[in-house]
């Protein structure tokens, strides 16, 4: 019997209070509520977790060991579950080889397309490449000097896993003696079995010949090699290695391309990857700003930071460099900036002729050398690659920075792969197009009837995947964009596009705020995509705060009423209309307009000082000039991909950080930033975790734990026992429980089952030993305090002003419900960001601090957004400047100044459409933001305004 509802009984996961609920199936369901109310606990930790657990229980014990933890959620019963797929925001890969193209698998289809219908062109002569005849190959060999030792090889295996035992036995029977395996020539008889799990390259040594005028032996050997390897032969000399192909080679210069296969176009395979950067597109090179941070100093004064401590010493390395300095007459007392550029280049990059010099060892041995002397830069780069010492690697690495690969110029592929064209573009040029441009290119692609027949299915698949990405508002992304640079919302929408393409039915999808990072203009597309998935016969459970998405849903579950211990209940459940009419629902109050975030009565004009970015050209920015008034709340808006992050993060933030001394941070491209003297500190408040380990928590991050430990150390009991504040730290020996080393939990390995975490049996999860827990303050131990919520701690420490002030800031940012000792790893991105905000609120304002936030409303309910705006306004009231990238209209309407980017995403963006107050933006007809802002400001006028300044 097909059940029409998912029925949940007795859910108690995290803060859920034994709730029971019926959710209609095959509908678009929104779960909402204030931050910390329990909506994620219900959607992901209960419903999805149980669906996943039931699937995993159907697998064998052997398979389960590879799939992580499948612990049963704390719930009595769930009926009506479908197979569950979670599409969350924690899926962005940090792998530098992962791109939008590889994640969506479009690049895999592209590789197949280029391998099947691509035409190779000579990169130097721009003519189509055809196969070499044996005569042409021999003509090339005859150009070599007489008596050159030549080896003819036949590449029979290229990067394939396996022992290749059958092939090796066959070669031995046919009389071959030597092979080159993975670059090393070996005798077949002495060959040890190959590792079956590794990729191997095997070239058969066909013949070894000393070059003379006899062409016949070369002809026979090349013919044999070509036959063995299906058209390929390698000429190996002491000086070089040349690939011959009877399939593809330039008639003029002999440039050869191997047989076109998909792996040739993979930057993750040795045959396709650029040999210099190994397919990364970047290499680590010495950054002169790190090597010479102050060019007003001379070499003798330590101007070259690498040599600051060894100038004029007996160090052998310095003796070599000093010989180079002496030979080229480089003055060690002249400021580096005044040295002739040619002489400085010799010092940095090495001599252009051999130099005679002496080395004096500490033992007194003198050795005479006559050789090229390596410059500082190549020497640092070489030592970084060669050293096995972690400390040395860090030291050499401190002078290096990522730079575009000089060989492939960021394309990641080798010359042969980049020579193959389809529609006049190589595969790298194809991936540089935006999704929108790629769709147009594929629609206009002209092919011969034969090519069209071969590529029909591949092109159809590529077009489908591109259109799905376009459908969810990602038309501005390029396929070569690194996955690690995607926002949580972008990564989630890519996964959403993949699921739309799969066209599965009868599935339960659980999504986490898919509207994040999406401009209001693109939201309708996303809602349409969600409805399409629902109409296929799927159930969509979406954790969401966006009002438009809620109004478009079939059913809303409002979890609350408050956060933490004050939440965990179902406040209301029903259609959007029923929620709006429910007096108990705070969500309904905002949806119906009973509650709202008011428009400020006045807009600040700033303190008279400004920051000005001149001619910014990073990524898609088109030489834009932007002025930010200091002492204001400024919001940067625009459709997705319009250039907001490029301007705010890469150009302005990184530029200021670099100017303020953080030299390893590379500023984005712009002519200059004016007004830097008006800023003494820049604070980026992102949604990255406040710590990577369970030891990090809100109390330690905000510094309030130091004050609490001081307080415990001053108690009569602590003084009697001789305990100082260090005794009350769970990170060091002394006061902590040594059985769990202050973690409070123990990990038990279960081999074929997931690891189990249990409370430490020595301390009972309290982190401290018995002696430390004998000390009490107002009847509570240090472990009891860590277990308090911010709200409870505020009341407990109400008489201790220093502690109360820090706790109050946590309370003010809406985190009254989190525990002081709550593990950083359990905090959401929005919660982590607000902990950081609270930490900054504690500090004394300088009036010269710039706060930068990227979409701070992520994960926030309208009621939380109201609190966030109040906190941001407080920072500005203290005299500092707040700069925010945001799509949330409630935040935008409260700004003093808006910088609207656009008009479109990708190459269609990168310009400033309009700047000014929200009222000015609302009147700008070219601004998409203004079109959505205008009705809100008109509503604000109808309801009156609040004084936020």
Model-derived segments and spans:
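Conserved phosphate-binding elements of NTP-dependent enzyme cores
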Residues: 1-949
